[in-house]
């Protein structure tokens, strides 16, 4: 890459989108602007091709995603993904918060799998601290992650059906998802972005009637999931729209770093819950669905079966849930009183405040400093991955020994998987690009973060 100043683009010389540099009092500063999609459009000028900008406002773009397609008739010759419209600087923001406050940021990236983000981040912090969440909290986390996985796959079905014109499937998917959100809201007070998993465990224990509510949910899902087979699997139009569309074989997945249902649909049974167990997943009996179809239809069938397996895991969680604490006993990490929500659902209950205020002055000071300043984490760096609904979600966390992270980098599966889209759609029809994008199931909050 040249570092020499560029020719004036107004004079028609040089590339206005290459790199330039200049000397400052702090050293050499490099500037890069523009993007290859502009060159892509310019290359097509004068040829019998048409360039279409799909998004970022299109309802089928799965958020603010821009796709640039170069077409010959109805066939896509070139495709480019343009991202960054939903950048929120979460990784940088976490560096300015305490370790516990970081949970409230990471839960907002992949907003369809918030509990997976929270768990992966907290596991990384716990690994740096050298502590392990109590068994009850581990089981608790597994149950919440599987509920979140079901909710995410239901959104995949609902939005994918809507984009294919199957509006009945959309209403079915969002109807079942509401059941999951009701469960999570009853427990955490929020439908999404829960910030419920904490370093050392979880925020609070299960309500007394929560077990029965989960059993009722399982009963509802067992009765309703077969309807998806009747509505989609045996539907000839649905099958024709997805079969042999968005083909991505195993070697392509491996070269692009694709994980999750897209990789398993190509025949590789790579699921971190099995190959690198965490949170006690090695003690649960469940299958990892795979296929060799490597197309949109195989990914649909795979996610449908994964919901059945998640229900199987949730049943085992309820059986394994033994009495015990849900937070480590280390007073330097855990708050001195169990957090309970007030009757209005908006703040701490009087019992919570009374327990803190009723202790010694030293306990009150410790609580105040623990909440406002946070706890110290020994210096070091770790990488902790979990299996999210979209693939390998990994957290690389670096500590310099202080009360805040020095660096948090996220290996986001939506970001990695999205780069496979050109390989899936180039050479295919424009109408099939919608199905291919839906089968990747990207969440732009995680892609752009």
Curated annotation (Swiss-Prot):
InterPro entries: NADH_Q_OxRdtase_suD, NADH_UbQ_OxRdtase_49kDa_CS, NDH1_su_D/H, NiFe-Hase_large. This is NADH-quinone oxidoreductase subunit D. The lineage of its organism: Bacteria, Bacillati, Actinomycetota, Actinomycetes, Pseudonocardiales. PROSITE patterns: COMPLEX1_49K. Its EC number is 7.1.1.-. NDH-1 is composed of 14 different subunits. Subunits NuoB, C, D, E, F, and G constitute the peripheral sector of the complex. It is found in: Cell membrane. Belongs to the complex I 49 kDa subunit family. Keywords: Cell membrane, Membrane, NAD, Quinone, Translocase, Transport. It comes from the Bacteria. The keyword Membrane applies. Pfam families: Complex1_49kDa (PF00346). The gene is nuoD. It catalyses: a quinone + NADH + 5 H(+)(in) = a quinol + NAD(+) + 4 H(+)(out). GO terms for molecular function: NAD binding; NADH:ubiquinone reductase (non-electrogenic) activity; quinone binding. It comes from Saccharopolyspora erythraea (strain ATCC 11635 / DSM 40517 / JCM 4748 / NBRC 13426 / NCIMB 8594 / NRRL 2338). NDH-1 shuttles electrons from NADH, via FMN and iron-sulfur (Fe-S) centers, to quinones in the respiratory chain. The immediate electron acceptor for the enzyme in this species is believed to be a menaquinone. Couples the redox reaction to proton translocation (for every two electrons transferred, four hydrogen ions are translocated across the cytoplasmic membrane), and thus conserves the redox energy in a proton gradient. GO terms for cellular component: plasma membrane. PANTHER family: NADH DEHYDROGENASE [UBIQUINONE] IRON-SULFUR PROTEIN 2, MITOCHONDRIAL, NADH-UBIQUINONE OXIDOREDUCTASE 49 KDA SUBUNIT. Its main location: membrane. It is a peripheral membrane protein.
